[in-house]
Amino acid sequence: MSLTTQETAAIIADYGVKEGDTGSPEVQVALLTSNINKLQGHFADHKKDHHSRRGLLRMVSQRRKLLDYLKGKNVERYQDLIKRLGLRR
């Protein structure tokens, strides 16, 4: 269910602040969002997979924390990120 190396590299290139940037909140949120979207398709077929559902909830929680951090540090970057990712906030 995880992302391939090429998908990860593409996300890092799109959302990174600089070359090779993997630690910025934008990159981390984009990677988590991509993983979450992949897992949602998995749960359409496997409704009783509660073990993976716990991992999904953990990823959603981590994304929420990173978004809250980014919103507190720089509101413009936060708003740009949620617009680019198409999140509901």
UniProtKB/Swiss-Prot annotation:
GO terms, molecular function: rRNA binding; structural constituent of ribosome
Protein name: Small ribosomal subunit protein uS15
SMART domains per the UniProt record, alphabetical: Ribosomal_S15
Originating organism: Pseudoalteromonas atlantica (strain T6c / ATCC BAA-1087)
Alphabetical list of Gene3D superfamilies matching this protein: 6.10.250.3130, S15/NS1, RNA-binding
Keyword field contains rRNA-binding: yes
Domain of life: Bacteria
InterPro entries, per the entry: Ribosomal_uS15, Ribosomal_uS15_bac-type, uS15_NS1_RNA-bd_sf
Family: Belongs to the universal ribosomal protein uS15 family.
GO CC, any one term: cytosolic small ribosomal subunit
Pfam families the record matches: Ribosomal_S15
Function, in words: One of the primary rRNA binding proteins, it binds directly to 16S rRNA where it helps nucleate assembly of the platform of the 30S subunit by binding and bridging several RNA helices of the 16S rRNA.
Transit peptide listed as a keyword: no
Key words of the record: Ribonucleoprotein, Ribosomal protein, RNA-binding, rRNA-binding
Assembly: Part of the 30S ribosomal subunit. Forms a bridge to the 50S subunit in the 70S ribosome, contacting the 23S rRNA.
GO biological process terms held by the UniProt record: translation
